[in-house]
Amino acid sequence: MVNRISILGSTGSIGVQTLDVARNLNIKVDGLAANKNIDLLEKQAREFQPKIVAVKDEERARILRDRLSDTDCKVVGGVEGLKMVASIETVETVVTSIVGIAGLIPTMEAIKHKKNIALANKETLVTAGHIVMSEAARMGVKILPVDSEHSAVFQSLMGNNKKDVAKIILTASGGPFRGRKKEELRNVTLREALNHPNWSMGSKITIDSATMMNKGLEVIEAHWLFEIPQDDIEVLVHPQSIIHSMVEYKDGSIIAQLGSPDMRLPIQFALTYPDRKQNNFSKLDIVKIGSLTFEAPDLEAFPCLGLAFEALRAGGTMPAVLNAANEKAVGLFLQEKIRFLDIPEIIEKVMGRHSVKPDPDIDDIIDVDLWARKIVEEIVK
């Protein structure tokens, strides 16, 4: 179990739940970082008394510095500030829960300083999986998944030989629009899309769940995290969100991890691994649930999942383009500037215009990220 952590993205859904876990386990929080929510960040800093607090927005960092002047917290700003929180000397594990590609640079900084990573920012592996995993191996750093699905796969692989794996089965809730046909999705509202049936999450990931892009990004993440060929990764819709994912072995055995749909469980396991600790979270009552069901995903109604498989197959810079186009399109949908079904159409158009660079470095990934966002703006004009 870790004793000291930093949290990148402490004011978001995962960050808040990580602090709940830290509170329960008496884990010391030495660093906190957020994008711009300084009201919540100030409360967190006063409770946990970290050494360093970072705000990506420089102006808000200045405001928070004044507010926390009566404490010993050092307040820093910008991307450099995030990098400082990622590399605090006393910290053993950095929890990376910043939304989007913004998490890539501070995650790489943490790896450079030999910090283990509790990874909740899937976009880091989606855009730069080949770089991140190879650098983590070189530095002897553990990447422990926080996503419930990848935590489930990680746990289902424990004690088994990876060469015996036949396939990984990622489960998806199906989101708020499960069972609807494409035509029925034409006029869905932002409010409907944000109404997830099982999980409490941030707005971006909730929309990704509604389009099934979240599962697509998780397929790419699983490919890098577990070194599994994409043809050996399957997605099943499991509306109850009780089985978080499964691993099928070559003898036909399937090992699955079950639990309540509570993100604090995979967060806690990433922080206590290889141990398990008592907690006060609600326990799973299987009898009460009664039955578990599964169905194949509808790729016609939810084309984002298929686009993610295509991007992984194309390789190189294509997953970064998929991710950037999706981030931009989801942002526009959250502002109610485009319709729900415009999201996959925009992503497909951007991917269609991209010439893949096969073995990109970080600069290439940042370049294509900016390029893809610009193309989305052109398409939507």
Curated annotation (Swiss-Prot):
It is an enzyme of class 1 (oxidoreductase). Its EC number is 1.1.1.267. Pfam families: DXP_redisom_C, DXP_reductoisom, DXPR_C. One of its GO terms (molecular function) is 1-deoxy-D-xylulose-5-phosphate reductoisomerase activity. Mn(2+) binds at residues 147, 149, 218. NADPH binds at residues 11-14, 36-37, 121, 123, 202. GO terms for biological process: isopentenyl diphosphate biosynthetic process, methylerythritol 4-phosphate pathway involved in terpenoid biosynthetic process. Coiled coil: none annotated. Pathway: Isoprenoid biosynthesis; isopentenyl diphosphate biosynthesis via DXP pathway; isopentenyl diphosphate from 1-deoxy-D-xylulose 5-phosphate: step 1/6. Its cofactor is Mg(2+); Mn(2+). 1-deoxy-D-xylulose 5-phosphate binds at residues 122, 148-149, 173, 196, 209, 214-215, 218. Keywords: Isoprene biosynthesis, Manganese, Metal-binding, NADP, Oxidoreductase. It catalyses: 2-C-methyl-D-erythritol 4-phosphate + NADP(+) = 1-deoxy-D-xylulose 5-phosphate + NADPH + H(+). PANTHER family: 1-DEOXY-D-XYLULOSE 5-PHOSPHATE REDUCTOISOMERASE (PTHR30525), 1-DEOXY-D-XYLULOSE 5-PHOSPHATE REDUCTOISOMERASE, CHLOROPLASTIC (PTHR30525:SF0). Catalyzes the NADPH-dependent rearrangement and reduction of 1-deoxy-D-xylulose-5-phosphate (DXP) to 2-C-methyl-D-erythritol 4-phosphate (MEP). Belongs to the DXR family. This is 1-deoxy-D-xylulose 5-phosphate reductoisomerase. It comes from Acetivibrio thermocellus (strain ATCC 27405 / DSM 1237 / JCM 9322 / NBRC 103400 / NCIMB 10682 / NRRL B-4536 / VPI 7372) (Clostridium thermocellum).
